[in-house]
């Protein structure tokens, strides 16, 4: 899975996503950021600024960001001769994050349920989540939370 998120500056969404286990979110304000993140960090989420700098030509910038984020194989390194060290560093970062993170269900159960209900209450999110989630435990947790 790959998540595209954002907020006014993109910084808040970046910080929020990076608190979750298994998520490596990068900050992307231009296509080069998307390309380098895909090649060097090989993460699974991007945070975009939806207000800051979103003027003329923003739709073109957004299109080019998506092209660079999803075009071709990820994790090839940039420049290519740095691939091995960059991949090794990405694994080290992932292992460090895993060592200090709670499992997702433990994390969700530690968060204020009203905050979660607000965050998960959107109709479009729910449609996407319930139609695509493969984690039965997570689906049941979210259903029960929203039914409270």
Each model region followed by its residue ranges:
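Residues at structural and domain junctions
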Residues: 2-3, 23, 52
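C-terminal binding/interaction regions
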Residues: 35-148
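Short Gly/Pro-enriched loop/turn and capping motifs at secondary-structure junctions
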Residues: 10-12, 53-54
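Short hydrophobic alpha-helical runs that function as membrane-insertion/retention elements
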Residues: 5, 24-28, 45-47
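Short Gly/Thr/Asp-enriched flexible loops that form oxyanion-binding sites at enzyme active sites
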Residues: 12-25, 29-33
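Short, structured active-site "lid" loops
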Residues: 1-5, 9
């Amino acid at each position: 899975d790959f998540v595209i998120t954002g907020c006014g500056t993109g910084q808040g969404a970046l910080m929020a996503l990076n608190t979750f286990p298994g998520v490596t979110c990068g900050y992307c304000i231009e296509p080069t950021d998307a390309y380098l993140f895909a090649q060097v960090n090989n993460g699974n989420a991007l945070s975009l600024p939806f207000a800051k700098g979103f003027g003329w030509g923003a739709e073109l910038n957004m299109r080019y960001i998506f092209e660079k984020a999803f075009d071709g194989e990820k994790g090839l390194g940039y420049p290519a001769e740095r691939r091995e060290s960059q991949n090794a560093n990405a694994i080290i970062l992932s292992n460090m994050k895993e060592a200090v993170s709670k499992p997702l269900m433990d994390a969700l159960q530690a968060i204020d349920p009203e905050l979660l209900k607000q965050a998960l209450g959107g109709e479009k999110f729910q449609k996407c989540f319930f139609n695509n989630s493969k984690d039965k435990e997570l689906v049941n947790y979210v259903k029960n939370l929203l039914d409270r």
